[in-house]
Amino acid sequence: MEIKIETIVPREVLENICITSLEGGSNYWYYLSSNAIKIIRNAVPKSVDSYLSTAILKAVLDHNVEVPINDVEDEEEIIGYLSSKTLQERIQALANSDDSWALHNELKEEGDASSSDIVFQYMVLGEVVYG
């Protein structure tokens, strides 16, 4: 017997994940190209939000922008996208995976660079690929 549990992930939790992962937890595998930054800044100018780590989520959630995420070792290679179209299904996949502890830590406000990295990988790639 299986019981399906759905959890609401507040925007504030998603913001914290983006801040922690983009400012350190995930920088060993991802790269934001100048094109990605341009896409983000066209949706959310610096005058609205000067921090890229929070502007990226605003661009995705508020302006339905799809942000390409590149490989840090091959800056030309797009390895995934941060998109409102895939965000829910990918976070649900995380909630149903062996890595769900990372999401639970974030929801309990006990997240760190490791848990944020795992959640961010699911948000962008749909699975843990790095680390």
PLM feature spans:
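Long, contiguous N-terminal structural blocks used for assembly/anchoring
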Residues: 1-69
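Short acidic, glycine/tyrosine-flanked loop/strand segments centered on an H-E-D-like triad
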Residues: 91-101
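Acidic, proline/glycine-rich low-complexity IDRs
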Residues: 104-130
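Short, flexible beta-strand-to-coil junctions
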Residues: 1, 70-76, 126-127
